[in-house]
Amino acid sequence: MALTLTDVKRIAHLARLEMADADAEHMLGQLNEFFGLVEQMQAVDTAGIAPLAHPIEQIQEVAQRLRDDAVTEVVNRDDNQRPAPAVQDGLYLVPKVIE
């Protein structure tokens, strides 16, 4: 997939970005390099490779810095909502901002 200068300008317009022609050409080169890298990664055959939940789990010499989650304190909803200006049925009431 290769973008054109028209594509870059259209994307900038949709994102409401002002972009000079020189900047658009520079961005075109960077985006096409990125998409080229993505195409190279997609071409790699990964059929026999199991997915990793975390890449460090495959390195035996590196100690896991992850620990099991443990409850350290109980959250009391009433205590947390006491300073709120308005609550109802355990939910915070906020002013309407979109009509």
UniProtKB/Swiss-Prot annotation:
Reaction it catalyzes: L-glutamyl-tRNA(Gln) + L-glutamine + ATP + H2O = L-glutaminyl-tRNA(Gln) + L-glutamate + ADP + phosphate + H(+); L-aspartyl-tRNA(Asn) + L-glutamine + ATP + H2O = L-asparaginyl-tRNA(Asn) + L-glutamate + ADP + phosphate + 2 H(+)
Enzyme kind, highest EC tier: ligase
Keyword Mitochondrion: no
Molecular function GO labels: asparaginyl-tRNA synthase (glutamine-hydrolyzing) activity; ATP binding; glutaminyl-tRNA synthase (glutamine-hydrolyzing) activity
One Pfam short name: GatC
A single GO BP: translation
SUPFAM superfamilies hit by this protein: Glu-tRNAGln amidotransferase C subunit
Keywords: ATP-binding, Ligase, Nucleotide-binding, Protein biosynthesis
Membrane-crossing residue ranges in chain numbering: none
Source domain of life: Bacteria
Enzyme Commission code: 6.3.5.-
Gene3D superfamilies, alphabetized: Glu-tRNAGln amidotransferase C subunit, N-terminal domain (1.10.20.60)
HAMAP family tied to this protein: GatC
Family from the record: Belongs to the GatC family.
PANTHER family cross-referenced by the UniProt entry: GLUTAMYL-TRNA(GLN) AMIDOTRANSFERASE SUBUNIT C, MITOCHONDRIAL
SUBUNIT field: Heterotrimer of A, B and C subunits.
Role description: Allows the formation of correctly charged Asn-tRNA(Asn) or Gln-tRNA(Gln) through the transamidation of misacylated Asp-tRNA(Asn) or Glu-tRNA(Gln) in organisms which lack either or both of asparaginyl-tRNA or glutaminyl-tRNA synthetases. The reaction takes place in the presence of glutamine and ATP through an activated phospho-Asp-tRNA(Asn) or phospho-Glu-tRNA(Gln).
Name by which UniProt lists this protein: Aspartyl/glutamyl-tRNA(Asn/Gln) amidotransferase subunit C
